[in-house]
Structures are given as structure tokens and as C-alpha cells.
Amino acid sequence: MAEEPVVIGDPAPRTRKWPIVVGVVVVVLIAAGAGFWVWHEQPSFCAAICHTPMDEYLETYEQEAGTAGVDKWGNEVANTNAMLAVSHKAQGKDCMACHVPTLSEQMSEGMNWVTGNYVYPLEERDTEMLTEARGVDADEFCLNESCHNLTRDDLIKATSDMEFNPHQPQHGEIECSECHKAHRASVMYCTQCHSEAEVPEGWLTVAEANKLSTAA
């Protein structure tokens, strides 16, 4: 059969390009979202978005382990290992390992930041406050398979050679965060009554910690 003649000036057949455009936009959005999510889990994200209240916390996290440093208030710390932010970083943990976000918590904190409804430096949070939004027991915050795979009894045995065993609940069970601090030097709780209790390197007695907290 003879081919139909092409008339000069006729428009070329139109192709539908919108599926390609939509596909490209979707790919770009997915890539951008994935990149943002990765950045969201980095310590630098905290200070970049919430610059004012978070700078000091990022600075404590970024310090080298086992050296002299400073806490979130700028006070000298004899050994940065006394701050959980530093010792956890040395074990490959980042901010999100402890500060596990929930949508309701993030929305609330975001509104407080936008409106300026927060104290500065930020109010210290204990393990109960850190787990409240997730409905997790305070003990489970630290004692779990991905962090410290131990029980309370294991902890008692681990420090049984100390004259005043900080994990022995003879005066009632206390939260881990009563002694172990993230962005300031940890505190030997036993010194509240026993001034002769052994204080780990870089840690503070209760009296020393109270003095710094009051000054801040």
C-alpha cells in the first residue's frame, strides 16, 4: 500500500510528557525526603534547627572522650567520660539513641521553640521524662538489648567491690539519671550522706553538683 503523503506544515504528533514530569518530581521529593531524614538523625541537625537552646548540648557531645572538657553551662569537667553524651558517642551512639522522637513530643517542642516558650539553658530531663511520651519504663530506657543488656541485679554485682555500692537499693531504688548525667558531670549520689564514698574520675559529689546547678 502506498504511504499517505505528509503535508508540510502539519504539526508533529504530540506526546504526553506529564507522566515523565510527575515521575521526576516524585523521585526528587523522595530523594530530598530521604536526605532530610538522614540529616534529621545527625547531631548537627539539633543545633541547626534549634540554634539557641541546642548549641551547648552539641558542643558537649562533640568533645573528645577521656580528656578535660566543659559541661553545658561552660563549667570545667576533669574527664569528659563523666558525661554520657561523650561516652555514648565513643560507643557509636548519637542523640537519637537516647532522645527517641514521637510525633506528639516533636510537635509540642516545635511549638515551644517557635513561640520562645522554654527556659534557657533547657530544663534537665531524667529518664522518666525521656520515656514518658513513649510509654516505656524508666529502667528500660537504659537497661535494654540495644544499650545496656543488664538487669538491676547484674549492676549490683558489677559494683559490689565498692564500699558504698551505688546500685544496692538499701535506701530505695533510684533512677539511673540520678547519678548518670548526659551533658554535665555525673554525680555520685551516695555522697549525699557518705562524704567518704568513692567518686569516679571526673564525677562530682552531690554538694559540688548542687553548687554548679545553683550558679547556672
Swiss-Prot record:
GO cellular component, one term: plasma membrane
MF (Gene Ontology): metal ion binding
Membrane topology recorded in Swiss-Prot or TrEMBL: Single-pass membrane protein
Induction cue: Is highly up-regulated by digoxin and other cardiac glycosides containing unsaturated butyrolactone rings, such as digitoxin, digoxigenin, and, to a lesser extent, ouabain. Is repressed by arginine but not by ornithine. Part of an operon that consists of cgr1 and cgr2.
Binding annotation for heme 1: C46, C50, H51
Mod. after translation: Binds 5 heme groups per subunit.
InterPro entries per UniProt: Multihaem_cyt_sf, Tetrahaem_cytochrome
UniProt binding sites for heme 4: C176, C179, H180
Annotated heme 5 binding sites: C190, C193, H194
Record key words, sorted: Cell membrane, Electron transport, Heme, Iron, Membrane, Metal-binding, Transmembrane, Transmembrane helix, Transport
Residues that, per the record, bind heme 3: C142, C147, H148
Cellular compartments annotated: Cell membrane
Binding site for heme 2: C95, C98, H99
Entries under PROSITE patterns matching the protein: MULTIHEME_CYTC
Transmembrane domains' residue ranges: 18-38
Oligomeric form and interacting partners: May form a membrane-associated complex with Cgr2.
Function field: Probably transfers electrons from a membrane-associated electron donor (e.g. the membrane quinone pool) to the [4Fe-4S] cluster of the Cgr2 reductase via its covalently bound heme groups.
Family: Belongs to the multiheme cytochrome c family.
Name listed for the protein in its UniProt record: Cytochrome c-type protein Cgr1
Species annotation: Eggerthella lenta (strain ATCC 25559 / DSM 2243 / CCUG 17323 / JCM 9979 / KCTC 3265 / NCTC 11813 / VPI 0255 / 1899 B)
Annotated gene: cgr1
